[in-house]
């Protein structure tokens, strides 16, 4: 019988529901859990490295409303430090940005097909973001006034 996850959670372990995306900056690691949370709409956990002996984990974001991110999946850190997250759900798939205080902004919505955004990353030479449409075999290059979008 598969009881290990329940046994470990009872002993204080943090359960992850469908962990799919992982990225890091200088101080933390972010993990997306696509179907985590009370509504199964997703969570993002943040592991903070305080010292060599101490690491903390926090529930950084949990989707609780329809107008919030729905099933976070692939993730990256933007050159300006925001978290950029792709959705993976059966409805409308979007691309979101989150600042360090948890504020969000919508970057894009896939109205072309029902395919999810995947493999989001930034050029090392400028602020151009690249993202794939999974089932269409397309890679999009997105650039522009990021400061205006983040307001």
Where are the language model's segments positioned?
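Sequence/structural signature of beta-propeller domains
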Residues: 1-151
């Amino acid at each position: 019988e598969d009881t290990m996850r329940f046994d470990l959670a009872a002993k204080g372990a943090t359960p992850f529901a469908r962990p799919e995306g992982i990225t890091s900056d200088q101080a933390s690691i972010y993990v997306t859990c696509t179907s985590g949370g009370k509504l199964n709409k997703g969570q993002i956990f943040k592991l903070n490295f305080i010292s060599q002996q101490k690491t903390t984990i926090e529930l950084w974001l949990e989707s609780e409303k329809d107008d919030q991110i729905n099933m976070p999946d692939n993730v990256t850190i933007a050159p300006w430090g925001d978290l950029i997250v792709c959705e993976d759900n059966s409805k409308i798939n979007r691309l979101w940005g989150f600042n360090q205080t948890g504020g969000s902004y919508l970057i894009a919505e896939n109205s072309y097909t029902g395919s999810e955004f995947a493999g989001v990353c930034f050029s090392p030479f400028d602020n151009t973001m690249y993202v794939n449409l999974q089932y269409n075999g397309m890679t999009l290059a997105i650039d522009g006034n990021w400061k205006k979008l983040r307001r």
